Amino acid sequence: MPYRKYREKKYETKYREAFKVFQEKIGITFTDEKLLIQAFTHSSYVNEHRKKPHEDNERLEFLGDAVLELTVSQYLFQKYPTMSEGELTKLRAAIVCEPSLVRFANELSFGGLVLLGKGEEMTGGRERPALLADVFEAFIGALYLDQGLETVWGFLKEIVYPKINEGAFSHVMDYKSQLQELIQRDGSGNIEYQILQEKGPAHNREFVSRVTLNNVALGLGSGKSKKEAEQQAAAEALKKLKEQL
C-alpha cells in the first residue's frame, strides 16, 4: 500500500474512533454515521479530498439553524408564559448567537472533531468562532435528520436549557423577566404587581407600583405608565434580592 493511502486510512480510522467516543459521551448513537461525519466536515476538507465521497456541512448548518430556532422558541414559550414577544425574541437571539453556540460547542470539544483542510488547519480554523458555531448548527441539523425533534430536544435539555435556567442569559431580559427568572430558580413562590397610586393630570400621569412575593413587599417603583412603574418596582426587588444572596 502506498504511503499516502496508508496515512489517509490511518487518519480515517482515527477520526472514526473519535466519533465513536463522542457518541458515547453524549449518549446518542447515530443510525446514519455519515450524517454525523458530514456535520463536522468543513468545505476546506472537501476541496482537498475531491476523490472521496465527502459532503461539507453547509446544508446541515442551514437546517440546524432553523431547528435550533424552533426548539429554543418552543422552550422559551413554555417556560415564560407572561414574557412579551419582544422579550422572547431578544432572549432567543442571545441563546442562538455565535458566542453562545461557540460556548456550547467548546463544552463538548467540537473543535477536535472537525475535518479541516490543511490550509484552514494551519490558520487556526479549528478554534475560529464562526466555524465552531456553524458546526454546532450542522450537528443539530444532522441529529434532527437522523433521530427527529425529540432527540434534539433531549440533547438541548442537557447542553443548552440548563444555562437558561441558571440565568446565563438574564442580562438581556427586562427587570420583570429577570425577577421572574430568579424566583423560579429558587422556587420561592408567586410574584404579584399592584398599582398603589395614580397621580397627576391626564397628559402627565404618574403611577406607583408595588411588587410582592407571597404577599411580602419586595419593591416600589414609579413611572409614566403602569408598565414602567412595574419595571422599576421589579428593579428595586432584584437589587434587594441580589444583596441577600
Swiss-Prot record:
Family the entry assigns: Belongs to the ribonuclease III family.
Residue ranges of every copy of the DRBM domain listed in the record: 174-243
Cofactor: Mg(2+)
Entry GO MF terms: double-stranded RNA binding; metal ion binding; ribonuclease III activity; rRNA binding
SMART domains: DSRM, RIBOc
Catalytic residues (positions): 65, 137
Name used for this protein in its record: Ribonuclease 3
Keywords per UniProt: Cytoplasm, Endonuclease, Hydrolase, Magnesium, Metal-binding, mRNA processing, Nuclease, RNA-binding, rRNA processing, rRNA-binding, tRNA processing
PANTHER family: RIBONUCLEASE 3, RIBONUCLEASE III
One annotated GO biological process: tRNA processing
Function summary: Digests double-stranded RNA. Involved in the processing of primary rRNA transcript to yield the immediate precursors to the large and small rRNAs (23S and 16S). Processes some mRNAs, and tRNAs when they are encoded in the rRNA operon. Processes pre-crRNA and tracrRNA of type II CRISPR loci if present in the organism.
Description of how the protein assembles with itself and partners: Homodimer.
Residue ranges constituting the RNase III domain according to the UniProt record: 19-148
One GO cellular component, as annotated: cytoplasm
SUPFAM superfamilies, A to Z: dsRNA-binding domain-like, RNase III domain-like
Chain residues that bind Mg(2+): 61, 134, 137
Reaction catalysis annotation: Endonucleolytic cleavage to 5'-phosphomonoester
Enzyme nomenclature, EC number: 3.1.26.3
Localisation per UniProt entry: Cytoplasm
UniProt cross-references to InterPro entries, sorted A to Z: dsRBD_dom (IPR014720), RNase_III (IPR011907), RNase_III_dom (IPR000999), RNase_III_sf (IPR036389)
